[in-house]
């Protein structure tokens, strides 16, 4: 439904009110009281819209309107009520005697809102403004990629170079539990799980188990060449750059290069992914009798 206009547009005066118009409106309301705003202009001898007469009286001419600066108590009341009711100025005005909704709205927009912002408080939610702004969203924190990057790299290395790999050791690599976790707690060192794994790998000849050259390996391609080619592989390089602790990579390289330079590789060893690592573990040796120390 469309609301009918309160008065006809023809002959209606707009703009600022004159003192004479104010006096006519005041005199009429003193005699007849408030109400009947649609017919009031004609009865009071005003060429104004009924709505304009009502707002002029409510916001400027009403005798109980409180003038002057807002007190600190009024400021606190407005802020508290705004936090509860939002921009419902008429509802807020009922709690501040003598203050009009229009005056409160203007005072909020020109003073209180800016004051709250200076104190680091959001004028809409009335909560502290986050360091990222007023959106309330926190920046995404990049999760450490050390564990996943290391696991993927070790799987790649194991699948290419290993002949025998201890089942418990690989389980520790993938899940980070059992002995590895206990060693980490005992040592108190952030990198102790990695160091423990590397020591155990070195002692049990995990990564380079034999110096025998396999038939699928060409005579003119040495272990060193394969080693360098492996670490220069684009995918391995990507993993390398995502690992936080580069000391881990250096230790791993030193283990891979440890021993006879003629150490061979398995030509068609399957690639191991973290997702299906447990299936890959089952095919490996379960012997874990040697204890090594990697300095």
Curated annotation (Swiss-Prot):
Residue ranges the UniProt entry marks as DNA-binding: 37-61, 89-112
CDD domains linked: SANT (cd00167)
Keywords of the record: Activator, DNA-binding, Nucleus, Repeat, Transcription, Transcription regulation
GO terms under biological process: cellular response to sulfur starvation; defense response to insect; indole glucosinolate biosynthetic process; L-tryptophan biosynthetic process; positive regulation of DNA-templated transcription
Domain HTH myb-type, residue spans: 9-61, 62-116
Description of what induces expression: Up-regulated by herbivory.
One annotated GO molecular function: DNA-binding transcription factor activity
Expression sites by tissue: Expressed in trichomes.
Record bears the keyword S-adenosyl-L-methionine: no
Disrupted-gene phenotype: No visible phenotype. Reduced indolic glucosinolate levels in adult leaves and loss of responses to brassinosteroids.
A single GO cellular-component term on record: nucleus
Compartments where found: Nucleus
The keyword Transcription belongs to this UniProt entry's keyword annotation: yes
Pfam hit, one: Myb_DNA-binding
Its biological purpose: Transcription factor involved in tryptophan gene activation and in indole-3-acetic acid (IAA) and indolic glucosinolates (IG) biosynthesis. Acts as a direct transcriptional activator of both Trp synthesis genes and Trp secondary metabolism genes.
Summary of subunit composition and partner proteins: Can form complexes with MYC2, MYC3 or MYC4.
PANTHER family per the UniProt record, alphabetical: F14D16.11-RELATED
Protein name according to UniProt: Transcription factor MYB34
Species the sequence originates in: Arabidopsis thaliana (Mouse-ear cress)
Taxonomic lineage from the root: Eukaryota, Viridiplantae, Streptophyta, Embryophyta, Tracheophyta
């Amino acid at each position: 439904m469309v609301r009918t206009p309160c008065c006809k547009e023809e002959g209606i005066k707009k703009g600022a009110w004159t003192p004479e118009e104010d006096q006519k409106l005041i005199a009429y309301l003193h005699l007849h009281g408030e109400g009947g705003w649609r017919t009031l202009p004609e009865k009071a001898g005003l060429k104004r819209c009924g709505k304009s007469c009502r707002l002029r009286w409510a916001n400027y001419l009403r005798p109980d309107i409180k003038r002057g600066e807002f007190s600190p108590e009024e400021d606190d009341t407005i802020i508290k009520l705004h936090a509860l009711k939002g921009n419902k100025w008429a509802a807020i005005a009922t709690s501040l005697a003598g203050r009009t909704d229009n005056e409160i709205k203007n005072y909020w927009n020109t003073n209180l809102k800016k004051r709250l912002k200076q104190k680091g408080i959001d004028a809409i939610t009335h909560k502290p403004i986050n360091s990222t702004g007023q959106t309330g969203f926190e920046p995404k924190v990049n999760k450490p990629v050390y564990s996943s990057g290391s696991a993927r790299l070790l799987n790649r290395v194991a699948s290419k170079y290993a002949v025998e790999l201890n089942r418990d050791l690989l389980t520790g690599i993938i899940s980070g539990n059992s002995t590895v976790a206990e060693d980490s707690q005992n040592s108190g060192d952030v990198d102790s799980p990695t160091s423990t794994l590397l020591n155990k790998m070195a002692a049990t000849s995990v990564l380079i188990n034999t110096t025998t050259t396999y038939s699928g390996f060409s005579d003119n391609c040495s272990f060193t060449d394969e080693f360098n080619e492996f670490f220069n592989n684009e995918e391995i390089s990507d993993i390398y750059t995502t690992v936080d602790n580069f000391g881990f990579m250096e230790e791993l390289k030193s283990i891979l290069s440890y021993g006879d330079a003629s150490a061979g590789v398995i030509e068609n060893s399957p690639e191991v992914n973290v997702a299906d690592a447990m299936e890959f573990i089952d095919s490996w040796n379960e012997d874990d009798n040697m204890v090594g120390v990697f300095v």
